[in-house]
């Protein structure tokens, strides 16, 4: 906003600002705001493309409407909820053998004479 000069009165400055505000509100000052719906449309199309990539089972070569994409997303979310609601599988019923560190990497086992160097 410009500073008010003593030559130009306050009333004149306020009128100028209010006319500019009305022009913007009525749409005469179309600039970047006019491009906004197009950028929103591009963003939405990008989001639908991203959903198509993320949801498994969507055929690559077929055209799907936005409603079909959303329906597949909803079905996928419901499938995930069912899987998460199932109880986790327990340990196997067979014999459980503990893993011995010495069997896997003997160099990791510290002998008593080497422990004295640590303290």
Curated annotation (Swiss-Prot):
Annotated Gene Ontology cellular component terms: cytoplasm; nucleus
Annotated compartments: Nucleus
GO molecular function: bHLH transcription factor binding; leptomycin B binding; protein dimerization activity; protein domain specific binding; transcription corepressor activity; transcription regulator inhibitor activity
Signal sequence range: none
Quaternary structure (record): Homodimer, and heterodimer with other HLH proteins. Interacts with COPS5 and COPS7A. Interacts with IFI204. Interacts with GATA4 and NKX2-5. Interacts with ANKRD2; both proteins cooperate in myoblast differentiation. Interacts with CLOCK and BMAL1.
Keywords noted in UniProt: Biological rhythms, Myogenesis, Nucleus, Repressor, Transcription, Transcription regulation
GO biological process: cellular response to leptomycin B; central nervous system development; circadian rhythm; epithelial cell differentiation; heart development; metanephros development; muscle organ development; negative regulation of DNA-templated transcription
Protein name: DNA-binding protein inhibitor ID-3
Chain's role: Transcriptional regulator (lacking a basic DNA binding domain) which negatively regulates the basic helix-loop-helix (bHLH) transcription factors by forming heterodimers and inhibiting their DNA binding and transcriptional activity. Implicated in regulating a variety of cellular processes, including cellular growth, senescence, differentiation, apoptosis, angiogenesis, and neoplastic transformation. Involved in myogenesis by inhibiting skeletal muscle and cardiac myocyte differentiation and promoting muscle precursor cells proliferation.
One Pfam assignment: HLH
Record-linked PANTHER family: DNA-BINDING PROTEIN INHIBITOR, DNA-BINDING PROTEIN INHIBITOR ID-3
SUPFAM superfamilies: HLH, helix-loop-helix DNA-binding domain
Chief place of localization: nucleus
Domain bHLH: 28-80
